[in-house]
């Protein structure tokens, strides 16, 4: 991992590749590199540890000519972050260059076999093994690159997205994928082709793309139609799709960081998410309804399902925990929330009548994709909740809903979380009303309340200056505890995750009642305790939990419902959110926690958008 860019065509390749890498910086990385076949048919490779800007500076006085090239941002999986381990990797013959996302699981065996044939290695990566393996077959079969790629990939076990080029033919480039995303952009009259891990580096050049499927190889030649085959050389049909992606949404829009922009984007993002789905009639609330297009084709299976399994990772898993409570309350169905990374390895009980909901911002999360493939094999209906249109998970599911919050660039997810929770709320409302477990009055009232969330979220954002001041009091801390109950317990988990992701402060989220079963031993005046203490059915109980902390000299920051005087008498500091229905509280209570994490990290002088060791899209298991 993490980001691939390739170009072949009539333009100078280097600017296209560098700008493409910059578009992919949000995915997270620790090194970067580029390879070009120059105007004199020389293969030039430049690699460096650190930022794309470092690579750009390094290449400033180098030969960057040529109309074909490949580039990569690497997030270390095999081998430490270094220039030697950075991609592209070049074959020992010097004739091939390759970039790769994924993990070749049997690389050690392949490496030993190649070493016996005289191959030597300059890095400790699985990627270099792959390019040497391709080169081995390339030298054997008369330097037919496509055949060599097919033979090598038949030997390789694991996940990959690769792009490879050959020095002898600067009009030819080959790309392939297996369990790792890869997109090919098609220029006018096939005069230019663009390759990338996702569409963001491509859309400023062309909106015509082909999403490669598992086991497919793209054989690309300038001026010719795109040719896609499988590993047995059989031709594969494909569809050129039109991508609708607003490039302006990829900018910071005047904010210091993408993360802050995306926090402030949330009111408008939720309006977009609900647009055309949530119909509100102010004069006649009895006409309020949800457009149920996602339920239409699979209505009976969704209504009749007795067991729903939600699979997700990270922030999406926290959204799934909220979805569980929403669906169980409104639809009276049994819901299980599983870590996608663990799901396949516990021999899960999945019946053909079950529904599996997969949640992923990128739509490319490897563990989630593998989980739904298993569930599909067992006959379950797969329902996707993703942000990235055309992504692997979106294509693998039977039905689903896009959250439509626009590209999320900051590694720490914000607007995708609230978008996912909004879609889960829409799903629970629609399904509950469809099957009669949610009565008309509650259904219509909830729709009206949900439509008001963006406006209420704006009121929360107005408190950002105060939250910024509060954050200054907490940068000293080495540990945080986040506590909530009911719908606010997943919010506590999400708040803790945001803080640890970008500020590198250890933080844990717990159900508030579990505090007395261990975490209370940590409470002292140096450990901030964040309570999400809004009005809900467990309000009195969380007040009791706060008193327990207060009696042990704990420092309390509370998220409270506006007008709450009781909590103010206990907490050291508080942040108010507007009143709303219990089921919708997470959409508001999470926003102050996002801002708190952001301002703590900024005060510590950290790179908020690209925190260390993290990748935006985790495309390896």
Name the predicted role of every residue range.
Residues 1-252, 256, 261, 268-307, ...:
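Conserved short alpha-helical segments that host acidic/polar catalytic motifs at enzyme active sites
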Residues 50, 67, 71-84, 281-300, ...:
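Glycine-rich oxoanion-binding loops at beta->alpha junctions
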Residues 259, 555, 568-570, 580-621:
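Generic C-terminus detector
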Residues 303-445, 449-452, 534-573, 596:
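Glycine-rich phosphate-binding loops that contact phosphosugars or nucleotide phosphates
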């Amino acid at each position: 991992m993490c980001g691939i860019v390739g170009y072949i065509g009539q333009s100078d390749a280097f600017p296209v590749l560098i700008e493409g890498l910059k578009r992919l910086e949000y995915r997270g990385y620790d090194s970067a590199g580029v390879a070009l076949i120059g105007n004199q048919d020389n293969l030039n490779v430049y690699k460096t540890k650190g930022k794309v800007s470092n690579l750009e500076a390094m290449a400033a006085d180098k030969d960057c000519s040529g109309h074909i090239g490949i580039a990569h941002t690497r997030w270390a999986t095999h081998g430490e972050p270094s220039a030697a381990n950075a991609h592209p990797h070049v074959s020992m013959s010097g004739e091939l260059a390759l970039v790769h996302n994924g993990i070749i699981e049997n690389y050690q065996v392949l490496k030993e076999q190649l070493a016996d044939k005289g191959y030597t290695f300059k890095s400790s990566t699985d990627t270099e093994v792959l390019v040497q393996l391709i080169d081995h077959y390339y030298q054997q079969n008369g330097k037919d690159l496509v055949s060599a790629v097919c033979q090598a990939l038949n030997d390789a076990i694991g996940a990959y997205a690769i792009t490879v080029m050959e020095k002898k033919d600067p009009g030819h480039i080959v790309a392939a994928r297996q369990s790792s995303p890869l997109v090919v952009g098609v220029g006018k009259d096939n005069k230019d082709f663009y390759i990338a891990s996702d569409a963001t580096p491509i859309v400023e050049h062309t909106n015509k793309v082909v999403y490669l499927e598992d086991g497919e190889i793209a054989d690309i030649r300038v001026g010719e139609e795109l040719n896609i085959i499988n590993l047995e050389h059989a031709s594969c049909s494909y569809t050129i799709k039109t991508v609708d992606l607003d490039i302006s949404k990829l900018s910071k829009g005047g904010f210091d960081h993408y993360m802050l922009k995306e926090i402030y984007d949330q009111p408008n993002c939720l309006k977009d998410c609900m647009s055309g789905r949530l119909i509100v009639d102010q004069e006649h609330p009895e006409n309020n309804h949800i457009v149920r297009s996602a339920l239409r084709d699979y209505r009976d299976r969704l209504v009749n399902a007795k067991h729903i399994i939600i699979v997700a990772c990270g922030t999406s898993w926290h959204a799934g925990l909220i979805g569980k409570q929403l669906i169980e309350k409104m639809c009276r169905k049994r819901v299980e929330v599983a870590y996608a990374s663990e799901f396949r390895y516990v021999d899960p009980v999945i019946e053909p009548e079950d529904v599996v909901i997969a949640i992923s911002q990128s739509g490319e999360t490897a563990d989630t994709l593998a989980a739904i493939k298993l569930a599909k094999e067992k006959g379950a209906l797969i329902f996707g909740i993703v942000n990235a249109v055309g992504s692997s998970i979106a294509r693998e599911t039977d039905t689903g809903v896009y959250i439509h919050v626009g590209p999320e660039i900051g590694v720490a997810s914000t607007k995708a979380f609230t978008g996912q929770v909004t879609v889960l709320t829409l799903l629970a409302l629609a399904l509950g009303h469809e099957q009669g477990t949610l009565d008309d009055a509650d259904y219509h009232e909830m729709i009206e309340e949900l439509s008001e969330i963006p406006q209420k979220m704006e009121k929360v954002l107005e408190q950002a200056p105060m939250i910024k001041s509060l954050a200054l009091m907490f940068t000293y801390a080495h540990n945080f505890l986040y506590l909530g109950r009911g719908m606010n317990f997943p919010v506590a988990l999400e708040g803790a995750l945001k803080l640890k992701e970008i500020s590198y402060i250890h933080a844990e989220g717990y159900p508030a009642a579990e505090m007395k079963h261990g975490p209370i031993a940590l409470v002292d005046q140096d450990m901030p305790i964040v309570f999400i203490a809004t009005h809900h059915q467990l309000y009195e109980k969380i007040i009791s939990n706060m008193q327990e902390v207060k009696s042990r000299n704990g420092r309390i920051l509370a998220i409270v419902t506006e007008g709450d005087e009781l909590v103010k008498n206990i907490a050291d500091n508080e942040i108010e959110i507007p009143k709303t229905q219990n089921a919708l509280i997470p959409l508001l209570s999470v926003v102050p926690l996002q801002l708190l994490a952001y301002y703590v990290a900024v005060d510590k002088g950290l790179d908020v958008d690209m925190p260390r060791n993290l990748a935006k899209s985790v495309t390896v298991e």
